[in-house]
Curated annotation (Swiss-Prot):
PANTHER family for the chain: PHOSPHO-2-DEHYDRO-3-DEOXYHEPTONATE ALDOLASE DAHP SYNTHETASE, PHOSPHO-2-DEHYDRO-3-DEOXYHEPTONATE ALDOLASE, TRP-SENSITIVE
Gene symbol of the encoding locus: aroH
The keyword Transferase is annotated on this UniProt entry: yes
Sorted UniProt keywords: Amino-acid biosynthesis, Aromatic amino acid biosynthesis, Transferase
Recorded GO MF terms: 3-deoxy-7-phosphoheptulonate synthase activity
SUPFAM superfamilies assigned to the protein according to its UniProt record, in alphabetical order: Aldolase (SSF51569)
Homology family: Belongs to the class-I DAHP synthase family.
Organism this protein belongs to: Shigella flexneri
GO CC terms in record: cytoplasm
Full protein name: Phospho-2-dehydro-3-deoxyheptonate aldolase, Trp-sensitive
InterPro entries (alphabetical): Aldolase_TIM (IPR013785), DAHP1/KDSA (IPR006218), DAHP_synth_1 (IPR006219)
Recorded catalytic activity of this chain's protein: D-erythrose 4-phosphate + phosphoenolpyruvate + H2O = 7-phospho-2-dehydro-3-deoxy-D-arabino-heptonate + phosphate
GO biological process: amino acid biosynthetic process; aromatic amino acid family biosynthetic process; chorismate biosynthetic process
Length: 348
């Protein structure tokens, strides 16, 4: 009989289950309290109950755990310094959506060489998240793959659905199940309505199929996530200006949704020129000083060293520098965070 299935499968490998990985790297009571408390604080900011600003900042992607931990340690100092004005959360992105092809992140390819040791990547991701949370720094990530979230979601305080997947039904269903607040980016063309539709969908109950923590295929029914919000990330042109934010809030109001959102300083808003994140910051700070309460949070891409680098076989990587989108360096990071804190002073 002719084969009709698995005709294009080149490799099959057993995968550790989420439950097995959690036994190796268990959540401690202290970390569980930290994650729970961080989520509650973020929810209050998104609901307008807390006047502070949510600041989600960090490398475009994680590729080096040592550099990531150094960044987290420095970020914790900024958290302590500005905790009365800012809720600082570290970007810990392990999955990268690609327009065509490219490195897909630490979980898929931790060795950066196409060997795709996914089991090792999942282990590294969970290990790092535990260490960062143990420092007292909340973590944020993009939920891209429908399965890998099962391995790390218990350690995440804030999640994102990216511009390429906000319109996806299965990602909206996944967001409805997540235990953390979830931001939906506007589309790559700048369309914010798809993000509003995603928020509405994620607030509803859904049923979908997914493996559970033990790897058993399961029918999940969700209760819905009430903490969805827009991430203004720009598109063909920036959309961080006051009129753009007002227009997005008008759409939220139309559907009786909270009129609070997050502005991404990078991506379409900086037109892929990383230093322009500082210009976006200046504009947002002025909007806050002018009395804007709609801006609940911001996102920015920064690392220890400015810029980006290519992966070249046989050549060492520059420590603390991004291998995906270019990032601000640490000195600019400190200035950016300081400016945000001073702007938020006017809310008190």
């Amino acid at each position: 009989m002719n084969r009709t299935d698995e005709l294009r499968t080149a490799r099959i490998e057993s995968l550790v289950t989420p439950a097995e990985l959690a036994l190796r790297y268990p959540v401690t009571p202290g970390v569980a309290t930290h994650v729970t408390d961080s989520r509650r604080r973020i929810e209050k900011i998104l609901n307008g109950e807390d006047k502070r600003l949510l600041v989600i900042i960090g490398p475009c992607s994680i590729h080096d755990l040592t550099a990531a931990m150094e960044y987290a340690t420095r970020l914790q100092s900024l958290r302590n310094q500005y905790q009365s004005r800012l809720e600082i959360v570290m970007r810990t992105y392990f999955e990268k959506p690609r327009t065509v092809v490219g490195w897909k992140g630490l979980i898929s390819d931790p060795d950066l060489n196409g060997s795709y040791r996914v089991n090792h990547g999942l282990e590294l991701a969970r290990k790092l998240l535990l260490q960062v949370n143990e420092l007292g720094v909340p973590t944020a990530t993009e939920f891209l793959d429908m399965v890998t979230g099962q391995f790390i979601a218990d350690l995440i305080s804030w999640g994102a659905i990216g511009a390429r997947t906000t319109e996806s039904q299965i990602h909206r269903e996944m967001a409805s199940a997540l235990s953390c607040p979830v931001g939906f980016k506007n589309g790559t063309d700048g369309n914010t309505r798809i993000a509003v539709d995603a928020i509405r969908a994620a607030r509803a109950s859904h049923m979908f199929l997914s493996p559970d923590k033990n790897g058993q295929m399961t029918i999940y029914q969700t209760s819905g996530n009430p903490y969805g919000h827009i991430i203004m990330r720009g598109g063909k042109k920036p959309n961080y200006h006051a009129d753009d934010i007002a227009a997005a809030c008008d759409t939220l109001h139309e559907f009786d949704l909270p009129e609070h959102l997050v502005v991404d300083f990078s991506h379409g808003n900086c037109q892929k020129q990383h230093r322009r994140q500082l210009e976006v910051c200046e504009d947002i700070c002025q909007q806050i000083r002018n009395g804007s309460t709609e801006i609940a949070g911001i996102m920015a891409e920064s690392f220890l060293r400015e810029g980006t680098q290519k992966i070249v076989g046989g050549q060492p990587l520059t420590y603390g520098q991004s291998i995906t989108d270019p990032c601000l360096g640490w000195e600019d990071t400190e200035r950016l965070v300081e400016k945000l804190a001073f702007a938020v002073d006017t809310r008190f």
